[in-house]
Amino acid sequence: MQKKIIVYTDGACSGNPGKGGWGALLMYGASTREISGYSPATTNNRMELSAAIEALETLKEPCIVHLYSDSSYLVNAINEGWLKRWTANNWKTAAKKSVENIDLWQKILTLIKLHDVTFHKVKGHSDNPYNNRCDELARQAIKNNR
C-alpha cells in the first residue's frame, strides 16, 4: 500500500529575475519535514517549480501525493492540461512560442509518472499556515545567501 503524503510548496524571488528561494513541507502521519533551497539567479516561476521538484525527489518510494501550491503557473499547467498540450506541440505554446522552463517541466513529468500526484491551488499569503511556512522557508533561503 502506497504512503499518502501531503506536500506544500512555495517559491520566492528577490527581483524577478533575481536571487530566489524555495520551501516545502512534506507531511506523513504525524511527521513533518521541512526542506528549502536557494538559487543566485532565477525567476519566481523557476522557484515554484523547483519547490515541487525537490519535494517529490525527496520521496524514496512511489507515493500518493496531494501537492498544494499557490502557483497558478504550476497547478494550471497540470490541471488545465497545458503541460500535455506543450509536450504534444513539441514544447510550443498555443502562440507557437517556446515554453519557458522546459528543463524543470521535464523533471516534473518524470516525477509525476513515479507518484500518484494530485495538484491543488491554495491562496497565497493568506491564512494557510502551511503555505505561509513554505513562504518563510523560501524567503529565509534567500536571506541566508545574501
Swiss-Prot record:
Its cofactor is Mg(2+). GO terms for cellular component: cytoplasm. Binds 1 Mg(2+) ion per subunit. May bind a second metal ion at a regulatory site, or after substrate binding. CDD domains: RNase_HI_prokaryote_like. One of its GO terms (biological process) is DNA replication, removal of RNA primer. Mg(2+) 2 binds at D10, D135. It holds the Pfam family RNase_H. InterPro entries: RNase_H, RNaseH-like_sf, RNaseH_domain, RNaseH_sf, RNaseHI. Its main location: cytoplasm. Endonuclease that specifically degrades the RNA of RNA-DNA hybrids. Belongs to the RNase H family. This is Ribonuclease H. It comes from Chlorobium phaeobacteroides (strain DSM 266 / SMG 266 / 2430). The lineage of its organism: Bacteria, Pseudomonadati, Chlorobiota, Chlorobiia, Chlorobiales. The gene is rnhA.
